[in-house]
Amino acid sequence: MSDIDQIPLTFTDAAAKKVKSLIEGEDNPNLRLRVYITGGGCSGFQYGFTFDDKINEGDLTIENQNVGLIVDPMSLQYLIGGSVDYTEGLDGSRFVVQNPNASSTCGCGSSFSI
C-alpha cells in the first residue's frame, strides 16, 4: 500500500519504538508484534499481543520505524480505523488498542463489545 490513507489500522510511533526495543535483545530480526482478537473477557472480545516471525496468508503487515505489526484478517475486521499504541503511566506500561468499532469496553480496557 503506497497511500498512508489506505492503511486500515494505525501503528503509532510510540508502539513501534517499544516493539523495536523489545526485539533488539532477541536473536531473531524477523520478529513482529501480532495483535489479535479472541472471544472472552468481561465484554465478549479481548485483545491479545504476541511476537511472531511468521506472516500467514491474508495477514496485514504495517511497518513503522523498520518494525512490523501483523494483523490476521478475522481480527482486522474488528480493528478497522483503530490504532495500536504504547503508553506509560502511573498504572504501568502497556500496548493499547484504540478501537472506534467498540460499543463498550471494560474497566481494564482489554476487552470490548461490538
UniProtKB/Swiss-Prot annotation:
Top-level division of the source organism's lineage: Bacteria
Residues engaged in binding iron-sulfur cluster: 42, 106, 108
Cofactor section: iron-sulfur cluster
Molecular function GO labels: 2 iron, 2 sulfur cluster binding; 4 iron, 4 sulfur cluster binding; iron ion binding
GO process annotations (BP): iron-sulfur cluster assembly
Subunit structure: Homodimer.
Full protein name: Iron-sulfur cluster insertion protein ErpA
Provenance organism: Haemophilus ducreyi (strain 35000HP / ATCC 700724)
Biological classification of the source: Bacteria, Pseudomonadati, Pseudomonadota, Gammaproteobacteria, Pasteurellales
